Amino acid sequence: MSAVLVSKENNQAVFTCEIPAEDFNNAIEESYKKNRSRFSLKGFRKGKVPRKMLERAYGEGLFYEDAVNLLLPGIYEKAIEELELEPVSQPDIDLDDITENNDVKVKFTVDLKPEFELGDYSKLSAEIEEFKVTDSDVDMKVNHELESNARVQEVEGREAKENDTVSINFKGFVDDKAFDGGEAEDYELVLGSHTFIPGFEEQIVGHNAGDEFDVNVKFPEDYHEDSLKGKDAKFECKINSIKEKVLPELDDEFVKDVSEFDTLDEYKKDIKEHLEKDNEQRQLVEKQNKAVEALIEATEISVPESMIDNEVNRQFQDFARRVQQMGLNTDQYFQITNTSEEDVKNELRANAELKVKGDLVLEKYIEKEAIESTDEELDEQLKEFAKVYGKDDEEKFIEEFKNSPNVEFLKEDIKRKKALEKLVENTKFEIKKAEEKEDK
């Protein structure tokens, strides 16, 4: 079998292969043997019907599709190796008419890894944000600690107000008919969280525990459930209880309870130092990202949509895991936020394209700059891993890791880090001051 390249352009290749008649006939026989136990005909035991009898009864091409599928993976792999192609997607496959005792012609269409040359990266420049710790940043961190140590207590004798947590029963109606998903009991809702559709929470404010009342709202025109889009709705509601958050007193005693410090000033100073360290890392990541973006801008590169699709799907899975950590599934999240999977994926697409292009230009940069990982760097990284994962026998851990497939991923990671470091060193950065950002 030899592959014939029909075309190779715009990051896509089209090529053909011929399956020899003898190979196809053998695959038909193999398919028959594999599947015959599924068939029965009158006068024969199940699984014992001769192939020709089955083909006469069910059609001559009964086993053709399965026979081709048995052969295609091997044919495809040999073809891309012979033609020296780097596919980045599953191929589309077209078959000519298939008949027994004849060669089978197969056409493959597949997206390819882009071929490109890096642009001039000798004078890269980029604008980056200044990450500066302010007093308000420190106060925000302190307030977060206060919130974390707050207690929630039930209140009586006053109306519900914003930021209260209310336990409610509700049942929704559209055109005087209850609708699916519109009913709950003892639902805890934080007023002002905008968890529900516009107008719902505002009508809870001002009511007391024990009150029963109607809430009238209108579903948004872009609501995720088609049957409810733009519809007027009535919710029969009852407030079971009202709770408020009580923050602890911010003083030296609070500081002693939540930290190793004795005074509020010492505590705030430590918070500021930690925030500044965090900002150093944020600044480094910002420089790396902007340097890669500058390299992309200097390079003429287009990528197949399939590569972007794959990255969008990967990022969506990350998003779904984060939603799960919030105690929700994606359907619940979409209902609460009035969005859809398509909306989220559309939002991810621009960043996914940037990620794909960034990976490609950085890979090319590593190749052009001949960046390699050394044994010393590998050992140093593995020693760090041994510490992090609490491996007592460091030498054994390092030896086992070096003999595992994961060592190649680690080598690539080391090369990537070195490339980013070099790229940042050779990029001129203009820092956009915090005041400039506020003015814009």
From Swiss-Prot:
GO terms for cellular component: cytoplasm. Consists of 3 domains; the N-terminus binds the ribosome, the middle domain has PPIase activity, while the C-terminus has intrinsic chaperone activity on its own. The lineage of its organism: Bacteria, Bacillati, Bacillota, Tissierellia, Tissierellales. Its EC number is 5.2.1.8. One of its GO terms (biological process) is protein folding. It is found in: Cytoplasm. Residues 163-248 form the PPIase FKBP-type domain. Involved in protein export. Acts as a chaperone by maintaining the newly synthesized protein in an open conformation. Functions as a peptidyl-prolyl cis-trans isomerase. Belongs to the FKBP-type PPIase family. Tig subfamily. This is Trigger factor. Its main location: cytoplasm. GO terms for molecular function: peptidyl-prolyl cis-trans isomerase activity.
